[in-house]
């Protein structure tokens, strides 16, 4: 049976991820971001969410991008959730090291071996994936440990171990609001992300002095950065920026972060300061 070219095109269009809608107040910021990324050689996915107002902006927000080491946020989240429910402790010894030390190595220094030790103790990638799905985090999948990921042939459009920008920001939001982990664990996570030693030419590059808690991801042809930017009044914006291909990935992340910061600052900075973080 012959299928018309029009019908095939219609099917292809329907298979594309739906565009993530930006909030009306942020359409001007969305236009700025679109103009900026149009001049870049990299393919760029962006999502940003004001954690007070709930307003969002995104570019390719529902398109999957490889997470690289940004997946370590999800690994940390599951471990901390199990600390909170009494199954584990940060003082547990795993492979001769404390979980606390492994978490620090994973998040501050992006240590791949420490990540795989924690991941194996949790039950492997599937355990993290299933926990995310059970908690309603859609659009983020965990398929391999870091060793397997590094051994695999590079494919910038591989959907394994990928996240949409919107899904990553949803995870960040729910961690920040202590919906998936308790406030004490959330604060521990933020403290480690604030000490991140990698990717200083990304989110932090054009925002000197601005508090940023983040986690980078890097593979051949990929550069990512996800985390929280603190606005002048003290409230935070959750941000995920994924880039693949091209030659200007770190600079693109730095410039994108600056545009996001300026855009949210102009609209959502609270005149009397943000509400205090729940202890």
Q: What are these regions, as identified by a protein language model?
A:
Residues 119-177:
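Mid-domain, small-residue-enriched loop/turn segments at the edges of structured enzyme/sensor domains
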Residues 4-15:
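Bacterial N-terminal signal peptides
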Residues 21-34, 64, 121, 170-199, ...:
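Structured C-terminal helix/loop/strand segments within mature extracytoplasmic catalytic/sensor domains
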Residues 14-22:
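Boundary at the C-terminal end of the N-terminal hydrophobic targeting segment
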Residues 88-128, 156, 161:
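Conserved catalytic neighborhood of penicillin-recognizing serine enzymes
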Residues 54, 64-94, 106, 239:
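Active-site SXXK
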Residues 45-50, 58, 74, 107, ...:
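Soluble periplasmic/extracytoplasmic beta-strand elements of cell-envelope proteins
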Residues 25-61, 229-230:
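A short, well-structured edge-of-sheet supersecondary motif
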